[in-house]
Amino acid sequence: MAARLCCQLDPARDVLCLRPVGAESRGRPFSGPLGTLPSPSSSAVPADHGAHLSLRGLPVCAFSSAGPCALRFTFARRMETTVNAHQVLPKVLHKRTLGLSAMSTTDLEAYFKDCVFKDWEELGEEIRLKVFVLGGCRHKLVCSPAPCNFFTSA
């Protein structure tokens, strides 16, 4: 069973953030504020980095009690096709990092909710989840598969 994460948008930074959903929440997303995101230059990860969780392909900071670094990520299977992915998602995300016009934040949020979490949480396909850090996170991946080139298709 995959670890449950809450996906939240940080409009100030225009990034998606992952936060672990605690057992006390019974699977519901956090109702509190987004909280303080760690600085991309920070390399310290608290001891409770969540190595006991069964999730693969996420940086260790994703399980930090202080919250993960800002992440942009996608689902590997969706990257391999243009079906259900507006304008090929990796290119869209790259344009956004350069400040160019691309998919709206609302469209991105809908994409991740519909494509990522449906397949990941409901179907249990967490092994296929890939994380692409486009903004300075230097943490190592947990149980990382072979390196993946962000700009090439599988």
UniProtKB/Swiss-Prot annotation:
GO biological process, one term: symbiont-mediated arrest of host cell cycle during G2/M transition
InterPro entries noted in UniProt: Transactivation_prot_X
Keyword tRNA processing annotated: no
Location of the region described as Mitochondrial targeting sequence in the Swiss-Prot/TrEMBL record: 68-117
GO cellular component terms listed in the entry, alphabetical order: host cell mitochondrion; host cell nucleus
Record's keyword terms, sorted: Activation of host NF-kappa-B by virus, Activator, Apoptosis, Host cytoplasm, Host G2/M cell cycle arrest by virus, Host mitochondrion, Host nucleus, Host-virus interaction, Modulation of host cell cycle by virus, Transcription, Transcription regulation
Claim: Cytoplasm is one of the keywords in the record: no
One Pfam short name: X
Post-translational events: A fraction may be phosphorylated in insect cells and HepG2 cells, a human hepatoblastoma cell line. Phosphorylated in vitro by host protein kinase C or mitogen-activated protein kinase. N-acetylated in insect cells.
Organism superkingdom: Viruses
Chief location category: host cell
Job description of the protein: Multifunctional protein that plays a role in silencing host antiviral defenses and promoting viral transcription. Does not seem to be essential for HBV infection. May be directly involved in development of cirrhosis and liver cancer (hepatocellular carcinoma). Most of cytosolic activities involve modulation of cytosolic calcium. The effect on apoptosis is controversial depending on the cell types in which the studies have been conducted. May induce apoptosis by localizing in mitochondria and causing loss of mitochondrial membrane potential.
Assembly mode: May form homodimer. May interact with host CEBPA, CFLAR, CREB1, DDB1, E4F1, HBXIP, HSPD1/HSP60, NFKBIA, POLR2E and SMAD4. Interacts with host SMC5-SMC6 complex and induces its degradation. Interacts with host TRPC4AP; leading to prevent ubiquitination of TRPC4AP. Interacts with host PLSCR1; this interaction promotes ubiquitination and degradation of HBx and impairs HBx-mediated cell proliferation.
Family: Belongs to the orthohepadnavirus protein X family.
Full protein name: Protein X
